[in-house]
Design a protein with these regions (language model features):
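Trp/Gly-enriched beta-strand/coil motifs that build multi-repeat beta-propeller-like domains
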Residues: 1-194
Length: 194
């Protein structure tokens, strides 16, 4: 709802989704039932049109993903089917080019990772295949060098973690092996105060 406080989407035992608008104290200010989606799951959230309100991507088995561009009230402003993506899996949503709009990394059935730079209409402005990552596992994203562009940590087949600082065009500015972490597992990609 663009108030600067993250909301929460819950799935109840009856498979209905409920959106909680949160306040700074940690309790809900109001709730909204997201109807007619009992067989769908939330696969990504982010501000996919740059209006300051978080949006939702839904998917159910065998279906095309459905993008909801949201209003501040928690109602749907525009619903868009993301065509030809029934077999694609989203791995991350973040602003990978510092334009104020959340972008999406997808994994295709051929194991290629594709970065979608999103535009204000809620569709991809440009796409980029992230080369040579077929056997790598996406692990985390965050702005690890404070340049306004989100970066990526991958886990390679040899269990080494690779930190990739991204440029605005989706290319890797710097790749850095995070040494001595082959037997470690990432627990949380954000810590308190960040």
């Amino acid at each position: 709802n663009s108030d600067g406080v993250s909301g929460v989407i819950w799935k109840r035992p009856d498979n209905k989704h409920v959106l909680w608008f949160m306040k700074k104290t940690g309790s809900a200010t109001s709730t909204r039932l997201l109807t007619a989606l009992t067989t769908w799951n939330v696969i990504a959230t982010g501000d996919f049109n740059g209006d300051g309100v978080s949006d939702i991507i839904w998917k159910r088995p065998g279906s095309q993903p459905l993008l909801w561009l949201m209003n501040k009230t928690g109602t749907v402003k525009i619903a868009k089917v993301l065509t030809a993506l029934a077999t694609w899996t989203p791995y991350a949503s973040a602003d990978f080019n510092d334009d104020g709009i959340s972008d999406i990394i997808w994994k295709r059935p051929d194991n290629k990772h594709v970065l979608w730079f999103m535009k204000k209409t809620g569709g991809p402005k440009t796409t980029k295949v992230l080369a040579a990552l077929d056997t790598w596992v996406f692990t985390a994203t965050g702005d690890f060098n404070a340049d306004g562009i989100f970066d990526i940590i991958w886990k390679k087949p040899d269990n080494k973690y690779l930190l990739c600082f991204l440029n605005e065009d989706g290319t890797f500015a710097v790749k850095k092996i995070l040494a001595a972490l082959a037997t470690w597992n990432l627990v949380k990609d954000k810590v308190a105060g960040e």
